[in-house]
């Protein structure tokens, strides 16, 4: 079983509630349709309801098993704002909650904060910086984590390591010029992530961007 088959099997065994705040993009809507058809998660699409239904029709996605969260539905916005206000440690005032709840990414992340969904998926249309800032604003860092980082899993033809052709690399996308403490945090978080996702027993090598000025820039 290859990596993606493993991940799909885990998802099917324990489907999570996933919010998609960019489903007004046809590519993302197609992803939502495929995930729903395969039973890999419960999909919540967040945005302008009329637009989302139009895109779904355009790409042939059946919305009967997908929850549409219409950020322009005034009654539902008010009901959601009241639920958010009632949650412990709500970080915003009433007016700000109602304003933010009308924005698809903000609404989706707010839903995650109060456990109406488990996960958010995005970044196709929004920038990495926007998604990270939104996550920090509404969700925050996991306990024990003090540095934001990313992890990529690479399938390298010809490589035969402890996990076959697969290697995890962190962090190649988010934290620029980390100090020693940040490097340590990234290494620990990367190891924990590959163990949680793939069940690997991680072995960590610390690789330098540049050796004695060989890669200036």
Segments (PLM) and residue ranges:
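Anion-binding alpha/beta catalytic cores of soluble intermediary-metabolism enzymes, centered on
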Residues: 1-217
């Amino acid at each position: 079983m290859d990596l993606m088959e493993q991940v799909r099997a885990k998802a099917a065994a324990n489907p999570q509630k996933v919010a998609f705040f960019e489903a007004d993009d046809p590519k993302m809507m197609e992803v939502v349709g495929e995930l729903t058809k395969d039973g890999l998660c419960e999909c919540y699409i967040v945005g302008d309801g009329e637009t989302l239904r139009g895109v779904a029709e355009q790409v042939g996605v059946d919305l009967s098993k997908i929850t549409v969260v219409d950020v322009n539905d005034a009654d539902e916005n008010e009901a959601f704002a009241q639920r958010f206000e009632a949650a412990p440690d709500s970080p915003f005032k009433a007016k700000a909650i109602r304003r933010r709840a009308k924005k698809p990414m903000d609404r989706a992340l707010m839903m995650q904060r109060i456990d109406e969904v488990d996960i958010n998926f995005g970044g196709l249309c929004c920038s990495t910086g926007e998604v990270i800032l939104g996550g920090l604003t509404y969700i925050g860092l996991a306990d024990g984590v003090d540095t934001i980082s990313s992890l990529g899993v690479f399938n390298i033809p010809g490589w035969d390591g402890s996990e076959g052709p697969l290697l995890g690399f962190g962090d190649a996308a988010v934290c620029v010029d980390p100090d020693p403490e940040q490097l340590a945090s990234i290494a620990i978080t990367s190891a924990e992530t590959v163990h949680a996702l793939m069940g690997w027993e991680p072995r960590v090598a610390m690789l330098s961007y540049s050796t004695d000025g060989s890669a200036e820039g």
